[in-house]
Curated annotation (Swiss-Prot):
Gene3D superfamilies: Regulator of K+ conductance, C-terminal domain (3.30.70.1450). GO terms for molecular function: monoatomic cation transmembrane transporter activity. InterPro entries: AAE_transporter (IPR050144), RCK_C (IPR006037), RCK_C_sf (IPR036721), Transpt_YidE_put (IPR023018), YidE_YbjL (IPR006512). Residues 190-275, 277-360 form the RCK C-terminal domain. PROSITE patterns: RCK_C. GO terms for biological process: potassium ion transport. SUPFAM superfamilies: TrkA C-terminal domain-like (SSF116726). It is a multi-pass membrane protein. This is Putative transport protein APJL_0985. Signal peptide: none annotated. Its main location: membrane. Keywords: Cell membrane, Membrane, Repeat, Transmembrane, Transmembrane helix, Transport. It comes from Actinobacillus pleuropneumoniae serotype 3 (strain JL03). It comes from the Bacteria.
Amino acid sequence: MSDIAIIVSLLSLVAVLGLWIGHIKIKGVGLGIGGVLFGGIIISHCTHLYGIELDAHTLHFIQEFGLILFVYSIGIQVGPGFFASLRQSGLKLNGFAVMIVGLSGILVALIHKLFDVPLPVILGIFSGAVTNTPSLGAGQQVLTELGGDNITAVMGMSYAIAYPFGIIGILLSMWLIRIIFKVNIDKEAQEFDNNQNQQKEGLDTLNVRLTNPNLGGLKLKEIPDFESHTVIYSRLKRNDQLIVPNVDTVLNVGDVLHLVGEKATLHKMQLILGEEADVSVSTRGTIFRSERAVVTNENVFGKKIRHLMLKGKYEVVISRLNRAGVELIPNGEMALQFGDVLNLVGRQEDIETVRAIIGDAHQKLQQVQMLPIFLGIGLGVLLGSLPLYLPGFPVALKLGLAGGPLVVALILARIGSIGKLYWFMPPSANLALREIGIVLFLSVVGLKAGANFLDTLLSPEGLAWMGYGAIITFIPLIVTGFVARIYGKMNYLSLCGLLSGAMTDPPALAFANEIKDGHGAAALSYATVYPLVMFLRIILPQLLAILLWTAS
């Protein structure tokens, strides 16, 4: 067999064995994707015994390419919600997540100095202790540029030794906080639901009868606050006739308007217009329909709603716009993006015409545009390669192959589309790309680390590494957990999601979700902190490597 055939065969064997190991669960907890690392270690141990040599350059390429695929697909997945998570309710959650990341970085520096742990070893322990694989890749890359020898193997070993307690430590932290604070799970779930219902600002509807005589005879666009675009006037009922109003529709006293907007805004408009009307303005039984359509036509990407002139040409109103699961109040200045779901109100034939304009081709939501993917990856690699020179630093700071594609993916996913290019990926395609990338990366890390793993694990040095990893895992989690619970008054279920997200650990999230079956509190806080934490976990090992290298 050729060298390439041998490597591909072994990688496939590692993936099969590792994924099988990852699916083994004890008390509902398993290694998950981390099992691939241990599959690589086992196969590497066997190849070492039989004297099989693998080409280092080929392995290095596969490792780096896998990492690029993984971080890029993560960025595309979380990009739409990344910047939103930094605002409003996400501020507190992200603040505590930053606290966990910061404490772990401080502990790394202290252990490195106090116990004289080699830099490659402590960075590998750090990545394993926080169960973050891209962190390992970022650390390996910057240490290689600093001129270290045998970096990949040493970091891979220390990562693998610290990894198991990285998972166990999160679960232990959740359990201890629950015991110490005597948490009642049902009560916590109820309090979370009550709080969410109070804070929720979804769109509501209200039927208002126009009784203000000062507004009779005015056009719709002339009524107060119309230009603020905070309310949509989707239907108008005059006597028994239902019509779709446009900006030039003249209002009569007694007209019933169907308004869409936030509850507080609707109440304000009711005070201006008149009184709430207990009248049905349903399209059922009329010539009008209310239907949903998806924006998939590349010719309308980036176009403002007012440029489509839907009201003027087709007498169709967009009453709601759903973007990435968030309901928005559409206005004329809002630009359409691929995947936007529009709620259309109008005659059936007019709605069909509008459907043809915006696309509404649901099969496109399952198709993958390959050009934007490789364009994004290329831009990410270029960004990651740009050096930032700082005085006193021995090497330039770089985002690297882990950080560059992540940052570019976050930005492109937030933008959504440029011209006919769109950066939407179906969830199934994104998951496949992400899993292939991480499997390739962990397989190679395991193959490089496995030759001496067992000897190191059973040595006093290996036991010390496990201890250091336990400290880096446990102390930031338990300290932040106590602070968040006592001073932040954080809900326990949200806190469990925060701890899982701060360690970017899906197995821990699965455990947190099972604390209260069918409840979404943990998943919500996990998703809120995940994007920022992933970015910090990639940047922090590079900063630590350069700072500690410079100080030594």
